[in-house]
């Protein structure tokens, strides 16, 4: 029978629930258990696809095309599993489904209410995710903090799960903050006590407390929390600030958190073999080189908007024994006059995805600088589209080359709306989303980066594409289309072969990178950037 673990948060948001959940998932997986994981987001949006990156951060796309919370990226990278549309559930999705059923008459004339209809739908989403993956354990994180009005239906559903499934099959983990008051010289447990009190008032008694802290938590403090929160002292787990996130699973294991979970859920599983993970941590903490990458974006004020890109760069750096120094460059501030001064010291230049016309010309200037000065370059999604626009303007000679997304009236629309997108009115969930195949051209830098495979699979999130009526003209001027869809209709990857590394892709390679298995195109870019640095 599937076991259910629910992770909630208290005191403050952004406390690291997602990393705790992902780390526990890794520990249980390394015990030989089949693990899946999901995130509940209490906002009313159906998904984050139309939300501003400034409000939500990155939108993480799964293989099946779901636009999801960035925590799913942490889950996939830590546990090394591919998630799906059932792994991220929002209030908007729940209410949409309940209202759809009501309109179809599936409730047989009943008055539709939060309890039982909304809570039943929430529970159905939990059990469906577990059933689809045949998981031994499903971990469900609830976004926000206990006390938020938006999360009440989710917490009520979690409370009901214990009665539905039995106490031996359900476990509650509560993550909180223990602030340190320098003036008093002590840690304060009262916020955690009140958070647990609030959770218990909703009918949920946590089995484990994970306390976020800057400093070590004394045994006396743990005993105090155990007494007031009614948990065992050994179930008060310290989550101290660490140098790298990859230390957290090992820190939790050192405190027997995974064993406590297995004991409570009556899971007979061998101890987790974390040898490979420990070697990864050792490598990460002792990198000998440093590579500087200029990340030229329009949302750089909020690094979470590019979190998978940053993590994928780090993964690639691990393979070269190199730390990655990110130079965050606001594309709105780049001009032809200051671009050399601003990004001239970078070992490599990366232009990531985005939407809209703000900051576009700055991205184009960064790409021009990379091409003209042979600085290793990687363009992703919008970065690929702007690389084609820059090539059209400054190499092909189409001075008014542009994108129909940012200028619908442009004459030379190098980037145009995909044919199957022309009559779509709704913005949400209508992009080209999910995993698609890409056929590689032999003898290219792209093919070499992928180990000379014929076809690769990558995740996409876009509405516009390269306009094929310009393909021959661009090829005649030196741009190589090194990756296309199997039917040859969609340009997936372009490159300039005589450069050290000038590659741009329509898909999002960062979404499938893993700490022990870096995405190959990004690894090729980082390798070229490091070689560029060493040749200076």
Swiss-Prot record:
InterPro entries: Class_I_gatase-like, CTP_synthase, CTP_synthase_N, GATASE, GATase1_CTP_Synthase, P-loop_NTPase. Mg(2+) binds at residues 71, 141. Residues 1-267 are annotated as: Amidoligase domain. It is an enzyme of class 6 (ligase). It comes from the Bacteria. Transmembrane segments: none annotated. CDD domains: CTPS_N, GATase1_CTP_Synthase. One of its GO terms (molecular function) is glutaminase activity. One of its GO terms (cellular component) is cytosol. ATP binds at residues 14-19, 71, 240-242. UTP binds at residues 13, 188-193, 224. L-glutamine binds at residues 54, 354, 382-385, 405, 463. The keyword Cell cycle does not apply. Pfam families: CTP_synth_N, GATase. GO terms for biological process: 'de novo' CTP biosynthetic process; pyrimidine nucleobase biosynthetic process. Its EC number is 6.3.4.2. Pathway: Pyrimidine metabolism; CTP biosynthesis via de novo pathway; CTP from UDP: step 2/2. It catalyses: UTP + L-glutamine + ATP + H2O = CTP + L-glutamate + ADP + phosphate + 2 H(+); L-glutamine + H2O = L-glutamate + NH4(+); UTP + NH4(+) + ATP = CTP + ADP + phosphate + 2 H(+). Keywords: ATP-binding, Glutamine amidotransferase, Ligase, Magnesium, Metal-binding, Nucleotide-binding, Pyrimidine biosynthesis. CTP binds at residues 13, 148-150, 188-193, 224. Catalyzes the ATP-dependent amination of UTP to CTP with either L-glutamine or ammonia as the source of nitrogen. Regulates intracellular CTP levels through interactions with the four ribonucleotide triphosphates. Homotetramer. HAMAP family: PyrG. NCBIfam families: PRK05380.1, PyrG. Belongs to the CTP synthase family. This is CTP synthase. It comes from Enterococcus faecalis (strain ATCC 700802 / V583). The gene is pyrG.
